[in-house]
Amino acid sequence: MSVAKNDLQAFINKYKSEKGKAFTNTSIANPRISVNIPTECYDTFLNLYALAITGGISLYFTEKPLDISPIRVDLDFRFSKDSHEDKYITRKYNDAHVHKIVDTYFKIINYYLDIDEKSNIAYVMEKPNPTEFRNKIKDGIHIIFPHIIVNNNIQYFIRTKILEKAQEIFDITDICAIPDDIVDKAIIS
């Protein structure tokens, strides 16, 4: 084990958080743990993390979202496995679906918030390919609106307004998830 990984592991062990307790970061791969790093120690964590990454160590920590942050969206699409006849799993949504979704978000955001036109930017990220998971086909996109900074209550409100338009924007063939499961609320807080 490298020195960088040992140093990071010792630091992480010092701030390990029990399930259900306050946390600042979680690891989404082995070991799956949560940590609660004090603000005054956070730069040390980032430096140790950077050293480990540049040393070739694969790490998968996420940060707990802050109450005031850019609008974030996680759309989780699930499809019946039998809806994919061919050997290769193909994507069921297309660019037109993504444009419709992002456009609907912008319409809702701009209707309820006073947003400068230059702030109407969205970044859309997607997995390279859909995957099979628990006998379903799993796919989805993440969207971030980097210049539209709001609190979590506003993000929940926007999510509610999106769910009201779900029939229009999630008209994707063979989708088998309900809108409340598609628009993941866990990304908000």
Question: Where are these predicted regions, by residue range?
Answer:
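DNA replication initiation on ssDNA origins
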Residues: 1-102, 111, 115-119
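Generic secondary-structure transition motif, activating predominantly at the C-termini of alpha-helices
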Residues: 12-19, 166, 170, 187
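Short glycine-rich, low-complexity/disordered patches
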Residues: 23-26, 108-125, 171-189
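Eukaryotic intrinsically disordered and solvent-exposed regulatory patches
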Residues: 44-48, 55-60, 122-131, 178-187
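Generic hydrophobic/packing signal
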Residues: 60, 72, 77-78, 127, ...
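Histidine-centered divalent-metal-coordination microenvironment in nucleic-acid enzymes
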Residues: 66-74, 119-154, 158
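Helical (often loop-to-helix) elements that flank the catalytic cores of nucleotide-handling enzymes
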Residues: 81-110, 137-183
